[in-house]
Amino acid sequence: MNARGNEQWNDQYPRPEVFEADIKDGTLYAMKEKGKVVGIVVLTEQQDKQYEDVKWEDAKGRYLVGHRIAIHPKWHRKGIANRFMDFTEKYARKNGFSSIRVDTYHKNERSQALIAKRGFTRRPGHINFPECTGPYYCYELILGTGDRRGR
């Protein structure tokens, strides 16, 4: 990421204890290819306090939050992120969530393009995290029966 000018992760975030807590909480999911982890994502019902200021379309429903999606550099551009998005949507539907919320760094154009392609709507404004530089954009996918990805 940093090599592409996308410094959303740094030595302050995410720290190893963040991932350790994700594993302990049972919210970190890994994807393997040929026995090796090629990517991870965190799926949780817990949102960062910064999300409270976002004007969500599904403000009263049960939402799933996707965090910390990371793909090993050798596996970039091989469909892993799309497979994670498929998994996230199926997981949300199977478990009765009405929407999915994600955020991404303002310079992470690849992530923004993928999120938009998947039917997420960018919410107005942005959020900031104290341990990170620059704003993050928030996105939401409503999982109603009439959405374009309804299954």
What are these regions (language model features)?
Residues 1-21:
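Conserved GNAT-fold acetyl-CoA-binding loop/helix
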Residues 71, 77-90, 113-117:
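Conserved acetyl-CoA-binding loop-helix of GNAT-fold acetyltransferases
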Residues 27-43:
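Conserved beta-hairpin
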Residues 42-68, 76:
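Conserved acyl-donor/pantetheine-binding loop and adjacent beta-alpha core of acyl/acetyltransferases
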Residues 103-104, 116-136:
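Conserved catalytic-core motifs of GNAT/GCN5-like acyltransferases
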Residues 76, 102-112, 130:
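Conserved beta-strand-loop-alpha-helix junction that forms the acyl-donor binding cleft
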Residues 85, 92-104:
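Conserved GNAT acetyl-CoA-binding A-motif
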Residues 82, 94, 107-124:
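Conserved active-site alpha-helix within GNAT-family acetyltransferase domains
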